[in-house]
């Protein structure tokens, strides 16, 4: 098969071609057991392929391949590693449309508004990190005229990366691109809901990278992710997902005394001050809530605090704009909003909507379910804007990970800051105001790892990204994160006498 998508091979055909396979040591290979599990299109529930059912034996094979490749990859000059990773990014850019269609097929994210964006960011991330190969610098430390004291940055070894289903390609890139440039080899465990797009990414990259440098497994957490975390040859774990799973991984890594990076949940606040530009703030709420992704984002602006003077107008404008968004087949170019990813998540989101009503909230359901009969069984959920929810309600306190946001009133700036910070999460926050002093003060006082003013959604590979509180440990993206997460420091003292 050509490395390009054959014109008459649609994304369904590509999923079938990748079915039943991991990628280990540069080649597609079935699970040791031969077992597979079914993956369905969330919009119609039609089967799209069978993913390899990864277990401990598959983990052993993938890690062994990474160990074999480790020394040669680490010995490759850093600048050359960077060139190879950047070349991967350019090749992935040539494959953007097929990757976008494949990730839309398995996740239900709208092709036009979400999946193509993810495929573009994927390529950009590898190109960006590829340029950092020359930045793996240590330091010279003044100590004694007769001694040369330096620090070196060395790779950790084999990195285990466990990725989520909501933006699988992008979040995988933010983990493995810096790991590879830093000289590590990688074993990725994909989410069971979205195994094919990232497998295709790995297949494409293995045309450039040496065998064993980048390996990928599909499977479920206990059978595949667990053995990966506890494997004795894994020297670092990076994970994006739920808080509870993150705690489990943290405990397992602690037994081995290896470093972890955890990007976990969020319940991100958005503050709209009385002097804010109302139209811009409403538009920011739509992008911030990731309604086009059915709200399936850890940074979703799911708590919106609006000054009492703007509250009613804000809610009406937000309802009208979300109501105008088109929900439909993710592959349709007219579609703004696709589906929830799975039945489990679909039921979870709907249970929270029911709970919000019971907790006293007024639910404003927006947009309209698709009328196409073939989509009748799909995991479509109308976006819901809650008003009047108590601050201690579960719908305000807990991460829903769906198209559900709560709009609440405040009267003073101090009240808004207090409500925004009253959460066990601390991933992202935004404030909308025309007052520079208010904006600057808020950036200092908001308890979040990523704060934006008068905008939302901007996440770039050269900006550190990560949360505080229960939103995780460590940062991703940026040069600093690459050095902190994927290198270990060695001190060298040379006595020259």
Feature locations, PLM:
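Hydrophobic face of amphipathic alpha-helices that form TPR/SEL1-like repeat modules
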Residues: 1-43, 368
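Residue-level signal for inorganic ion chemistry
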Residues: 45, 81, 103, 126, ...
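Conserved C-terminal structural/oligomerization subdomain of aldehyde/semialdehyde dehydrogenase
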Residues: 46-49, 234, 271, 326, ...
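Glycine-rich loop-to-alpha-helix module at the N-terminal edge of alpha/beta enzyme cores
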Residues: 46-136
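Short, well-ordered beta-strand elements within core beta-sheets of diverse protein domains
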Residues: 47-54, 68-75, 161, 270-273, ...
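Structural signal for hydrophobic packing residues in well-ordered secondary-structure cores
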Residues: 70, 74, 89-96, 100, ...
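Rossmann-like NAD(P) dinucleotide-binding subdomain of oxidoreductase/dehydrogenase enzymes
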Residues: 138-280, 410
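ALDH superfamily catalytic-core signature
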Residues: 208, 244-390, 453, 496
């Amino acid at each position: 098969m050509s490395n390009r998508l054959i014109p008459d091979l649609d994304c369904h055909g590509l999923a079938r071609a990748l079915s039943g396979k991991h990628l280990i040591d540069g080649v597609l290979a079935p699970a040791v057991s031969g077992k597979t599990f079914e993956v369905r299109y969330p919009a119609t529930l039609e089967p799209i392929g069978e993913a390899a059912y990864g277990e401990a034996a598959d983990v052993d094979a993938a890690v062994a391949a990474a160990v074999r490749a480790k020394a040669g990859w680490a010995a490759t000059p850093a600048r050359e590693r960077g060139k190879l990773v950047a070349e991967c990014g350019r090749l992935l850019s040539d494959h953007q449309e097929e990757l976008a269609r494949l990730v839309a097929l398995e996740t239900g994210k709208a092709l036009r508004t979400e999946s193509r964006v993810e495929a573009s960011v994927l390529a950009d991330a590898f190109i960006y990190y590829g340029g950092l190969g020359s930045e793996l610098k240590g330091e010279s430390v003044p100590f004694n005229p007769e001694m040369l004291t330096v620090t070196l940055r060395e790779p950790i070894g084999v990195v285990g990366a466990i990725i989520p289903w909501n933006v699988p390609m992008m979040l995988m890139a933010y983990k493995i691109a810096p790991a590879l440039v830093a000289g590590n080899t990688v074993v990725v465990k994909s989410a069971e809901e979205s195994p094919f797009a990232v497998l295709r990414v790995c297949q494409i990259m293995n045309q450039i990278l040496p065998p064993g440098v980048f390996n990928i497994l599909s499977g479920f957490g206990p059978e595949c992710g667990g053995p990966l975390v506890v494997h004795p040859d894994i020297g670092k774990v990076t994970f994006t997902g739920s808080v509870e799973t993150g705690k489990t991984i943290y405990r397992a890594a602690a037994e081995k005394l290896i470093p972890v990076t955890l990007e976990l949940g969020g319940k991100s606040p958005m503050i709209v001050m009385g002097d804010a530009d109302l139209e811009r703030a409403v538009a920011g709420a739509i992008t911030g809530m990731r309604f086009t992704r059915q709200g399936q984002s850890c940074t979703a602006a799911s708590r919106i605090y609006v000054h009492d003077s703007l509250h009613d107008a804000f809610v009406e404008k937000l309802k009208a704009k979300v109501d105008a968004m088109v929900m439909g087949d993710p592959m349709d170019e007219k579609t703004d909003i696709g589906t929830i990813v799975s039945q489990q998540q679909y039921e979870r989101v709907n249970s929270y909507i029911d709970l919000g009503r019971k907790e006293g909230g007024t639910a404003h359901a927006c947009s309209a379910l698709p009328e196409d009969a073939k989509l009748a069984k799909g995991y479509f959920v109308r976006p819901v804007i809650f008003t009047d929810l108590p601050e201690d309600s579960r719908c305000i306190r807990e991460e829903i990970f769906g198209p559900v946001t709560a709009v609440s009133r405040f009267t003073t700036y101090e009240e808004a800051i207090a409500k925004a910070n009253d959460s066990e999460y601390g991933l992202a926050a935004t404030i909308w105001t025309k007052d520079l002093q208010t904006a600057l003060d808020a950036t200092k006082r908001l308890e979040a790892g990523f704060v934006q003013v008068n905008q939302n959604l901007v996440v770039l590979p050269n900006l550190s990204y990560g949360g505080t509180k229960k939103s995780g440990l460590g940062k991703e993206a940026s040069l600093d994160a690459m050095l902190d997460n994927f290198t270990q420091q060695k001190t060298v003292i040379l006595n020259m006498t």
